[in-house]
UniProtKB/Swiss-Prot annotation:
GO cellular component: cytoplasm
Catalytic activity: pseudouridine(1915) in 23S rRNA + S-adenosyl-L-methionine = N(3)-methylpseudouridine(1915) in 23S rRNA + S-adenosyl-L-homocysteine + H(+)
Binding site for S-adenosyl-L-methionine: L76, G108, F127, G128, L129, L130, T131, F132
Listed name of the protein: Ribosomal RNA large subunit methyltransferase H
Species for this entry: Streptococcus thermophilus (strain ATCC BAA-491 / LMD-9)
Amino acid sequence: MKVKLITVGKLKEKYLKDGIAEYIKRLGRFTKFESIELTDEKTPDNASESENKAILDKEGQRILAKVGDRDYVIALAIEGKQFPSEQFAKELEQATLRGYSDITFIIGGSLGLSPKVKKRANQLMSFGLLTFPHQLMRLVLVEQIYRAFMIQQGSPYHK
């Protein structure tokens, strides 16, 4: 199985890069992990609705170009489903049992995700109604993916 994380925007903070690298290293025991950073579109401060839509469409095209036809896609969106960690672990396990060999996670840019990306997703997932910096969400998500694998192994890490 391969896990892929597609994100919009460049991660600059070293402490976040270090944390993500640590969890990717730990995940190496279970899966191949690929992280793909896509260029974000610059959003003017007073962007109109049509400008925002055009930005979402451009970013969405870049995202979808990196998604495989047979990938199981989980996109982060505020309106998505919230999972307890144990259920999230089962969701990943079920995806592989349904024949998906690649699981792709998507974190959009500052405007979120285009409707086309959301439509392509097999599952929309939310970490709640709070707003998080997109860069921090990468670390939180990668840790939760690692936690899911540890839960599947019956490891005490989750306790």
